[in-house]
Amino acid sequence: MDVLRTPDERFEGLADWSFAPHYTEVTDADGTALRIHHVDEGPKDQRPILLMHGEPSWAYLYRKVIAELVAKGHRVVAPDLVGFGRSDKPAKRTDYTYERHVAWMSAWLEQNDLKDIVLFCQDWGGLIGLRLVAAFPERFSAVVVSNTGLPIGVGKSEGFEAWLNFSQNTPELPVGFILNGGTARDLSDAERSAYDAPFPDESYKEGARIFPALVPITPEHASVEENKAAWAVLETFDKPFVTAFSDADPITRGGEAMFLARVPGTKNVAHTTLKGGHFVQEDSPVEIAALLDGLVAGLPQA
């Protein structure tokens, strides 16, 4: 496959973003090498807190959470999904599938050999991150899900349907504008520009374009069976599993119910509702960091 790489200068001087880039090369099943970017801040001898973003953002979404957690002494790892941020971007929309995303991030996880992970995942960060939990449950010590799900082809919310229609039909995908529309506060011009930074033009956005159409919302969608198999693993996951959905997200409202009903790790832990929109990391970063700090403090020492 043909691959685009956003020039480094696009990421210079971004607001509140001083983290050094780290890169891992993974190989697709077709032999194509793909470079995946991640942030790795804080003491390397601490258990990693893994922050996974979704559509159409990148690790920048977690910049305030990262700073808060590092100040509390934690190690924080935040990757960019393939097609986003500083990670490579396959050039064709058809290069992107749900299963390829899972395979790419599985290879990334294994190459970096992360263990004893505390995962926070939102949006597609959950659709992919929870598949990683199901594939490598021994690598994860705790999970926090926020404004996400693991769909098995049983329908969609009105909010998601509106987003799907917009994303597939708009002539240009205005990423910074989309991020601003999904937060309770107004992002600054500099913040919106940072979300636009990974995409010099529309040709870099094929991964962002196709993501909404890859969500398994009908029985005929690809990955329904794979997600059902992942649910079977999650139904045995008895380590701490916290729901932290926001109070103003029309896309995933009520999505915590399935986790609470099916994942044994949701018992005997405190759940929370965060204030904010779909991109709750922009609205409640201090609260997210405090939640993760408290969760880690309650885990047995590795």
UniProtKB/Swiss-Prot annotation:
This is Haloalkane dehalogenase. Pfam families: Abhydrolase_1 (PF00561). SUPFAM superfamilies: alpha/beta-Hydrolases (SSF53474). Its EC number is 3.8.1.5. NCBIfam families: PRK00870.1 (NF002043). It catalyses: 1-haloalkane + H2O = a halide anion + a primary alcohol + H(+). HAMAP family: Haloalk_dehal_type1 (MF_01230). It is an enzyme of class 3 (hydrolase). Catalyzes hydrolytic cleavage of carbon-halogen bonds in halogenated aliphatic compounds, leading to the formation of the corresponding primary alcohols, halide ions and protons. Keywords: Hydrolase. GO terms for molecular function: epoxide hydrolase activity; haloalkane dehalogenase activity. Belongs to the haloalkane dehalogenase family. Type 1 subfamily. InterPro entries: AB_hydrolase_1, AB_hydrolase_fold, Epox_hydrolase-like, Haloalkane_dehalogenase, Haloalkane_dehalogenase_1. Residues 48-152 form the AB hydrolase-1 domain. The gene is dhmA.
